[in-house]
Amino acid sequence: MNKFFTRFKASEHGGEYLMRLISAWLCSLVLILLFRPVKEVFNKEYAGEAPYLLLILFFTVFYGLLTVLRFIPKLRDMKTDCAALLISTAQFTVAYAVVMFREKGTNIDFFLGVVLFITLAVWYTVGKQRIRLPKFTKKCWIAVLAISAVFMLVFTALAMSLRYYKLCTPCFDFGIFTQMFENMKDGLGPVTTVERNYELSHFAVHFSPAYYLMLPFYTLFPHPVTLQILQGIFVTSGIIPVFLIARKYGFSLIHSSLFSAIYALYPAFTGGCSYDIHENCMLPAFLLWLIWAAEREKTIPMLVFALLTLTVKEDAAVYVAVIGLYLILSDRSEKTRALGAVIFGAACVYFFAVCAYLNNSGLGIMEWRYKDYMYRGGALITSLIVTAFTNPGYILSNLFTGEKLTFTVQTLGVLGGIPLVSRKIARYILLIPFVLVNLMPTYPYQDR
């Protein structure tokens, strides 16, 4: 008997017992949600009415299964307890986040707690226990890419289409674009009557020629759902350049496909579709293709995708100009720097030309979104530049307000803050659009 206990103790580490206990406990907590009303979870009375016997039963079953896995010959050398901790932590946080959202809506405090919880699990299993991804077959990356694309397309296209049929659109913008595409199909141009309550070209509000890329498909299938599907296709197509960029940096096929999966799960892209079709749905794919072309030093694709990005919206020139500036200041070949200078200059010229068109023939460039930075007698661009150089503290005080801080955590926090950590200072230039377009404006939809 003593020999048995000696061998048993030698085969397992104390940390593995703890991981197994936590994994079984978390799995049990999620499973008993099926036997309790969801509305009672975040309530002090839940503990008094919890199904204790079921909790104990599920815990015993899960702990037993995890223990059995340790004695299966093929799994003996695998860190099954580490994997179980990661999986159970993920499913627990997702399940309780869904319950929290249904019961109380978005809660940044709960989100931060979830991030800390997941970080500890990842640090212990990946950092301390050195768990590694299992060996995949050579073609497994194709399945990961396909599943990621299907998931993203279903969420951004199918879910939004079903919401349209339920008449659950959140604002009247979808009516604007449906009418606009119908008029474009009939040869009347991007004309609407509901955007400002009189006949008006949408390009007098936002200059977005890229909409004509969607027109052939709408002409073939003239229905509002077509627009929802096209939105999903454009957003989902960004999976491909993400995969190619990862491959350019030397990641394996499976790791590159996992980057694409992260893209598919990133809420800033999928959640952005919840306001129905807007021109911004084309930005992620065009920008990622532009970055891929820059990384591969492909001249024609770089110029093509820079042009496509510019046609999305007047302020899309900011993204192109910043990428050009980044290429100029980063450690690149002379050819790439020259191309960076070209697209930077072209983006600036295009931006000022479109602004002049909107100010003279349209409704203006909506400079009121930056009214907090415009001093008396100052123009928009001048005011922003002068304020940035003479009073940066004022800008910082406006950037880190409650809702904007929440938005920053939601967008950068889910990426582990990686965009904020780099040894190459030129990369921080790429944060300019995030600050200028999302955080600085007073328009609330820029940080939602």
Predicted feature residues:
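Start-transfer (signal-anchor) and selected internal transmembrane alpha helices
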Residues: 1-26, 60-156, 339-343
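Transmembrane-helix motifs of polytopic, lipid-linked glycan transferases
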Residues: 62-71, 225-250, 289
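Hydrophobic, aromatic-rich transmembrane alpha-helices
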Residues: 63-72, 394-398, 405-435
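Transmembrane-helix signature of polytopic, membrane-embedded enzymes
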Residues: 79-80, 236-265, 284-285, 301
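Multi-pass, polyprenyl lipid-linked donor-dependent membrane glycosyltransferases
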Residues: 105-110, 230-236, 261-294, 308-319
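Extracytosolic helix-loop segments that constitute the early lumenal/periplasmic catalytic or substrate-binding loops
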Residues: 158, 176-201, 209-210
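Membrane-interface transmembrane helices that cradle and orient dolichyl/undecaprenyl
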Residues: 249-250, 282, 288-302, 328-334
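Perimembrane helix-loop-helix junctions
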Residues: 319-348
